């Protein structure tokens, strides 16, 4: 059955949203404001999934996708939407999530943080499959919502130097002894180096090693090998162990890392994000600053150039060891401290044990920082960091943690905005600023919140009685 629909909005999977007969329809390929004919492909009791058959009235924000694989490859979802409109949708999603999850509205919306929209992806995980029906070996991202590997010949979100490797990598894998036992190639680009990590399930032969070395010499890359878990990753050539690094030129820092270490996908946006975070924190020379979920010290080392002391805490000892080494190499050893701890299990006693911090930066993974937020909420007004900057890759967990800090912890949500870390995808990276309130203001806000809750309960009771 073909229906005609008016598209009202867009979700973060880049599906148009419409309503019909009390049901929500998610429409693949449609944009807000468009009038389209659709074919339903899946029916559920409360919603349907449909795909566009014809765009009768296109959106002014619709653009031609640059990539010939768009729509099949799962690497991108929004190439058909103008970049500024993509960011606007993410900003609206962030604000909506703050309200629906945390009943919060930022006092100020920060301008979006933009960077390159093409060739930005300096980290990628490429799947490898032997598919005789498609000519042999495929190397690329998965097809959208599928375990199949897309038949990719180029990729515009990868740097051109990596995109050009997709077809040569196919030929190289095909020449190996067991191409069907090499399921993955991870890509990590430093400012000067391309590293490829080959996952192999069987031992490599001397012939395989020769093929890898010939490929490296021809294409100017470095190979690392992984036979089992992450701890088995090692460079093919020993002298390449410390070649991978990114820079933070504003702070005069070079940050070495291993291809298995967490680093931001988008180097240009990372530099801009670090700069903005430090400006928002407004660190003074006498300040003591905490950097929680510090990783390699991406924020800790820049913070140490501005404050009296920067303390980085992270769950991975390998990362804190490398952060400590980088700090020493840059002459920041006396102004930094690093600790290894599971930040998902901390409490207020632990937080008090670290001593007082004037400022705090929190940059957790998608799981957020709920335990940290709860610990902060139990501090007395004089114990709290005066300002906190929270960098997030999940609006849902950010809103959850923000609600704890604001409704229970005596903080105000001063500002928030999106960081366009992943153009053409639905991933929302964001940054938020919290400021500690004085005790009188906190008590007043809590009393107002209790009064509103009572009024809402009374309204619901009256409605039920009627």
Curated annotation (Swiss-Prot):
TRAM domain boundaries: 1-54
GO molecular function per UniProt: 4 iron, 4 sulfur cluster binding; iron ion binding; RNA binding; rRNA (uridine-C5-)-methyltransferase activity
Active site: 393 (nucleophile)
Residues binding S-adenosyl-L-methionine: 264, 293, 298, 314, 342, 363
SUPFAM superfamilies: Nucleic acid-binding proteins, S-adenosyl-L-methionine-dependent methyltransferases
Stored CDD domains: AdoMet_MTases
Top-rank taxon, per record: Bacteria
Record has Disulfide bond as a keyword: no
Example GO BP: rRNA base methylation
Alphabetically ordered keywords of this record: 4Fe-4S, Iron, Iron-sulfur, Metal-binding, Methyltransferase, rRNA processing, S-adenosyl-L-methionine, Transferase
Chemical reaction(s) catalysed: uridine(1939) in 23S rRNA + S-adenosyl-L-methionine = 5-methyluridine(1939) in 23S rRNA + S-adenosyl-L-homocysteine + H(+)
Binding-site positions, [4Fe-4S] cluster: 67, 73, 76, 155
EC number: 2.1.1.190
Entry-linked PROSITE patterns: SAM_MT_RNA_M5U (PS51687), TRAM (PS50926), TRMA_1 (PS01230), TRMA_2 (PS01231)
Top enzyme category: transferase
Family: Belongs to the class I-like SAM-binding methyltransferase superfamily. RNA M5U methyltransferase family. RlmD subfamily.
Function statement: Catalyzes the formation of 5-methyl-uridine at position 1939 (m5U1939) in 23S rRNA.
Name of this chain's protein: 23S rRNA (uracil(1939)-C(5))-methyltransferase RlmD
Gene label: rlmD
């Amino acid at each position: 059955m073909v229906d005609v629909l008016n598209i009202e909005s867009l979700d973060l999977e880049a599906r148009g949203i419409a309503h019909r007969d009390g049901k929500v329809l998610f429409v693949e390929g449609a944009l807000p404001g468009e009038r389209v004919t659709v074919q339903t492909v899946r029916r559920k009791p409360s919603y349907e999934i449909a795909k566009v058959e014809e765009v009768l009235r296109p959106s002014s924000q619709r653009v031609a996708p640059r990539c010939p694989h768009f729509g099949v490859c799962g690497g991108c979802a929004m190439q058909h939407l103008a970049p500024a409109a993509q960011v606007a949708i993410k900003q609206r999603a962030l604000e909506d999530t703050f309200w629906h999850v945390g009943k919060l509205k930022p006092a100020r919306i920060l301008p979006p943080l933009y960077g390159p929209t093409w060739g930005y992806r300096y980290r990628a995980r490429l799947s490898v499959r032997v598919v005789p029906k498609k000519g042999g070996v495929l190397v690329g991202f998965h097809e959208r919502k599928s375990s199949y590997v897309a038949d990719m010949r180029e990729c515009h979100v990868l740097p051109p130097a990596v995109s050009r490797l997709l077809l040569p990598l196919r030929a190289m894998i095909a020449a190996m002894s067991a191409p069907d036992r090499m399921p993955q190639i991870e890509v990590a680009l430093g400012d000067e180096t391309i590293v490829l990590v080959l996952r192999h399930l069987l031992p490599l032969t001397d012939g395989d090693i020769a093929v890898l070395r010939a490929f490296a010499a021809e294409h100017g890359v470095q190979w690392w090998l992984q036979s089992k878990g992450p701890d088995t990753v090692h460079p093919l050539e020993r002298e390449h162990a410390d070649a991978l690094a990114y820079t933070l030129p504003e702070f005069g820092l070079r940050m070495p890392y291993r291809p298995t270490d967490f680093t931001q996908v988008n180097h240009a946006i990372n530099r801009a994000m670090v700069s903005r975070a430090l400006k928002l924190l407004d660190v003074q020379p006498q300040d003591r600053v905490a950097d929680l979920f510090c990783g390699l010290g991406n924020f800790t080392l820049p913070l140490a150039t501005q404050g009296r002391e920067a303390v980085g805490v992270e769950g991975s000892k390998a990362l804190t060891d490398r952060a400590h080494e980088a700090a020493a190499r840059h002459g920041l050893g006396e102004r930094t401290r690093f600790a290894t701890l599971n930040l998902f299990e901390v409490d207020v006693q632990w937080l008090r044990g670290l001593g007082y911090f004037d400022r705090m930066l929190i940059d957790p993974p998608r799981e957020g920082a709920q335990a940290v937020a709860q610990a902060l909420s139990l501090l007395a007004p004089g114990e709290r960091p005066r300002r906190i900057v929270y960098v997030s890759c999940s609006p849902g967990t950010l809103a959850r943690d923000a609600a704890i800090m604001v409704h229970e912890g005596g903080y105000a949500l001063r500002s928030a905005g999106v960081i366009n870390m992943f153009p053409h995808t639905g991933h929302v990276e964001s940054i938020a600023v919290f400021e500690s309130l004085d005790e009188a203001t906190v008590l007043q806000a809590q009393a107002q919140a209790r009064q509103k809750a009572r009024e809402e309960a009374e309204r619901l009771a009256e409605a039920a009685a009627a």
